[in-house]
């Protein structure tokens, strides 16, 4: 393990700043304290308070939003990081691993990645993602994209249809059709912090939220060596050049992951599994007693001293012998969380250490908590019960269907902007008005300033291209403009905006 040197990974350089020199420990710490301030004060973090965790449009403040969930993940991530660093200290390896001046940054990077891990999620969570992807797939038909034009190509955008004898342009068209049809919250998070909000975070901090490592346009087979790391899109074509720079700065291979990302992922896994069940009890989907029966059934035979006995059964015994029944739900989940975290955090930390070489290189092709251990089995039964009894609940499904309709409907409403000819849309952007397009003008006025500026900046960088390339790439960034705007809405704003524009109120 002589090749492990975290100084080569924990970079405090920033993409929009001159090279930073920092030799003293506190000078390094200051860079990551600056990251913390930029992140905590960003609008994207504030919007998480009105984005769903499991129950969309929830008015009960006791039920988790994305923000409260992210704060819980932040705490578990901090705990895992401290556990890892303490074990390095006990083994006398801190200096050998290049961590002497980086203990606080190590912890801070994990914490802030945990806080940010959901900022790219659209309204209504995964159903919002599906709505965006299905809407664009129906119009761009990425499945028909090959190296040559297809007779059954159903792409509705003329600039993106494949043409004979235009192999280079066809490759670009194909990539863009795939890219726009694979919206993903993790990829949108990279776009948010770098392109839209321009937080100018350190490379290490951004690297820690690059959870998946393939571009959204990827249409080839996924190599078996990275099939877990590449199972979802991690960034868009628009951010590809930045991700290339980030990989060079952090000494990451093409499809490899930043090492501290594994900790963020484990913290999320530990947090949401218990939280989703607690929210379900708060929503009266089942009682604690019914939940205990569901969990016992999923686990199978319980033996004294096994992990189920030390966590779930132990928490249930605490309330069975407790006092006032009216607080039994709170008591049960407090104990369940404490007992689960106490067992799973050390397990995640040890997995990080046991696989340190692969984790450091970023090619450890699984999650820290994805193994054959009782810890993994415990997480799996939490997930199974949530899938069978929470996510399939009629109230949840009804709200998800509403969310799907809201996002699809908003894309329909704003779609006239995508149908405008390039010259006319350019005039609309430049003049902030177009007399021949009164509806489109009013729709354009509703787009937020930061999203419009991101579009303008992207287009200014395309003026050297041929007319054919310009038409292709301009459509891409115009579509990104709509995806950015709608995905940045909160659940409630999207719902209200849809009702207003449909004249439903």
From Swiss-Prot:
<dbReference type="InterPro" id="IPR020779">
    <property type="entry name" value="dNTPase_1"/>
</dbReference>
<dbReference type="InterPro" id="IPR006261">
    <property type="entry name" value="dGTPase"/>
</dbReference>
<keyword id="KW-0378">Hydrolase</keyword>
<dbReference type="Pfam" id="PF01966">
    <property type="entry name" value="HD"/>
</dbReference>
<dbReference type="GO" id="GO:0000287">
    <property type="term" value="F:magnesium ion binding"/>
</dbReference>
<dbReference type="InterPro" id="IPR006674">
    <property type="entry name" value="HD_domain"/>
</dbReference>
<comment type="similarity">
    <text>Belongs to the dGTPase family. Type 1 subfamily.</text>
</comment>
<feature type="domain" description="HD">
    <location>
        <begin position="66"/>
        <end position="273"/>
    </location>
</feature>
<dbReference type="GO" id="GO:0008832">
    <property type="term" value="F:dGTPase activity"/>
</dbReference>
<protein>
    <recommendedName>
        <fullName>Deoxyguanosinetriphosphate triphosphohydrolase</fullName>
        <ecNumber>3.1.5.1</ecNumber>
    </recommendedName>
</protein>
<dbReference type="InterPro" id="IPR003607">
    <property type="entry name" value="HD/PDEase_dom"/>
</dbReference>
<dbReference type="InterPro" id="IPR050135">
    <property type="entry name" value="dGTPase-like"/>
</dbReference>
<comment type="function">
    <text>dGTPase preferentially hydrolyzes dGTP over the other canonical NTPs.</text>
</comment>
<dbReference type="InterPro" id="IPR023293">
    <property type="entry name" value="dGTP_triP_hydro_central_sf"/>
</dbReference>
<dbReference type="GO" id="GO:0006203">
    <property type="term" value="P:dGTP catabolic process"/>
</dbReference>
<comment type="subunit">
    <text>Homotetramer.</text>
</comment>
<keyword id="KW-0460">Magnesium</keyword>
């Amino acid at each position: 393990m002589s090749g492990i040197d975290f100084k080569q990974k924990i970079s405090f350089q920033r993409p929009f700043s001159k090279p930073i020199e920092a030799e003293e420990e506190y000078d390094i710490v200051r860079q990551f304290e600056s990251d913390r301030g930029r992140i905590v004060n960003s609008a994207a973090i504030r919007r998480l308070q009105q984005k769903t965790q499991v129950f969309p449009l929830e008015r009960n403040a006791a039920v988790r939003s994305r923000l409260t969930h992210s704060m819980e993940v932040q705490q578990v991530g901090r705990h895992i990081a401290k556990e890892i660093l303490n074990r390095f200290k006990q083994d006398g390896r801190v200096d050998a691993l290049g961590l002497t001046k980086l203990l606080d940054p190590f912890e801070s990077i994990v914490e802030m990645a945990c806080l940010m891990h959901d900022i790219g999620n659209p309204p209504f969570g995964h159903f919002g993602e599906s709505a965006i992807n299905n809407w664009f797939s129906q119009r761009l038909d990425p499945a028909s994209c090959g190296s040559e034009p297809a007779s059954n190509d159903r792409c509705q955008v003329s600039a993106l249809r494949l043409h004979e004898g235009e192999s280079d342009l066809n490759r670009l068209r194909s990539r863009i059709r795939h890219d726009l049809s694979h919206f993903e919250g993790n990829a949108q998070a990279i776009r948010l912090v770098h392109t839209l909000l321009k937080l100018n975070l350190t490379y290490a901090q951004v690297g820690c939220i690059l959870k998946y490592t393939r571009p959204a346009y990827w249409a080839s087979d996924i190599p078996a060596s990275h099939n877990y790391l590449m199972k979802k899109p991690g960034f868009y074509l628009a951010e590809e050049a930045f991700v290339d720079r980030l990989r060079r700065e952090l000494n990451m291979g093409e499809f490899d992951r930043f090492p501290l990302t594994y900790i963020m992922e484990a913290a999320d896994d530990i947090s949401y599994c218990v939280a989703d069940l607690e929210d379900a009890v708060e929503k009266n989907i089942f009682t604690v007693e019914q939940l205990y029966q569901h969990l016992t059934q999923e686990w199978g035979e319980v033996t004294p001293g096994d992990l189920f006995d030390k966590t779930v059964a132990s928490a249930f015994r605490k309330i069975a012998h407790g006092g006032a029944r009216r607080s039994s739900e709170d008591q049960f989940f407090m104990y369940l969380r404490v007992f689960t975290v106490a067992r799973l955090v050390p397990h995640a930390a040890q997995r990080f250490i046991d696989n340190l070489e692969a984790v450091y290189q970023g090619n450890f092709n699984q999650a820290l908590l994805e193994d054959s251990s009782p810890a993994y089995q415990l997480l799996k039964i939490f997930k199974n019960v949530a899938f069978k009894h929470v996510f399939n609940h009629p109230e949840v499904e009804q709200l998800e269907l509403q969310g799907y309709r809201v996002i699809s409907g908003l894309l329909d409403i704003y779609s006239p902007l995508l149908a405008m000819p390039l010259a006319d849309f350019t005039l609309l952007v430049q003049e902030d008005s177009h007399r021949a397009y009164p509806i489109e003008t009013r729709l354009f006025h509703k787009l937020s300033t930061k999203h419009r500026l991101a579009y303008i900046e992207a287009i200014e960088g395309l003026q050297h291209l041929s007319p054919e390339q310009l038409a292709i790439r301009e459509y891409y960034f115009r579509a990104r403009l709509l995806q950015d705007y709608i995905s940045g809405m909160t659940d409630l704003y999207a719902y209200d905006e849809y009702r207003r524009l449909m004249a439903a109120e």
